[in-house]
A protein has these predicted regions:
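Domain-level detector of nuclease and nuclease-like folds
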Residues: 48-238
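Short, His- and charge-rich active-site/binding loops that engage polyanionic ligands
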Residues: 3-68
């Protein structure tokens, strides 16, 4: 299929994508895709030598091959699920963090799916990335250095009602949209699964921290207002 699955911003300096952007809807989260039939491997759209070598196992140390777009977000077909196992979608993620707090956040995001499309950007922030001084690193199975992210984030955008039948760029009233971002320190969080308001920031603040501009499809006249707002309770977070 030539349908777009997701979009990523790959940085060969860290052998990982700085962000992965994708639409989310119930059409994507149900179907025949089965992760038991998916294999970790290279992304055919990027030179192999630029990617982490993950086909023979995970990163060395206590790191999982952490998905940015979760496999569970692409059950609609085996092909789309398989693509979530490409190395360009992976980062070295602390095992406890991945399996507990981050995994809970991924599930929370799926619970925010509505009839209109939910737009998601998942990202990894590497402190020191721009001056090549990233202190924390691991290696892959080919002994390539793989920096470990300092923070992970998710940015979300959808309509408030969830059933408008409109695309984002058709909406000219900021009160019809809601946006938020989650910013989590990448650490061994043990069995902690709590997502709280302290983990939430505005999309505008996320843009300041990362240097990226998210959700360009928002009408320019309302973009700033939408991105400044961040109401955790609207997203089931206290």
């Amino acid at each position: 299929s030539n349908a777009r699955n997701y979009t990523y911003c790959f940085d060969p300096k860290v052998r990982a994508s700085l962000w992965v952007a994708y639409p989310l809807h119930s059409a994507y989260t149900s179907g025949s895709g089965n992760r038991n039939y998916s294999d970790f491997g290279y992304d055919p759209k990027v030179d192999d030598e630029l990617q982490a070598a993950l086909g023979r196992g995970s990163y060395n140390g206590w790191y999982d091959r952490g998905h940015q777009i979760p496999a569970a977000d692409r059950k609609c077909s085996q092909q789309m699920m398989d693509q979530t196992f490409y190395a360009t979608n992976m980062t070295p993620q602390q095992g406890k963090f991945n399996q507990n707090k981050w995994g809970v956040l991924e599930g929370r995001v799926r619970n925010m799916i509505c009839s209109d499309t939910l737009y998601v950007v998942t990202g990894a922030y590497f402190e020191g990335e721009h001056d090549s001084s990233i202190a924390n690193k691991t290696t892959d199975k080919s002994a390539n250095n793989c920096p470990t992210p300092t923070y992970y984030y998710k940015a979300l955008l959808r309509t408030k009602k969830g059933n408008t039948g409109k695309t984002i760029n058709e909406i000219s009233d900021a009160n019809q949209l809601r946006a938020i971002a989650f910013w989590l320190e990448h650490a061994d969080t043990g069995n902690d699964t709590n997502i709280t308001a302290a983990d939430c920031i505005s999309v505008a603040e996320l843009e300041k921290r990362t240097g990226f501009t998210f959700f360009p499809m928002i009408d320019d006249a309302i973009e700033a207002e939408v991105k400044r707002a961040a109401v955790p309770s609207e997203w089931g977070v206290n």
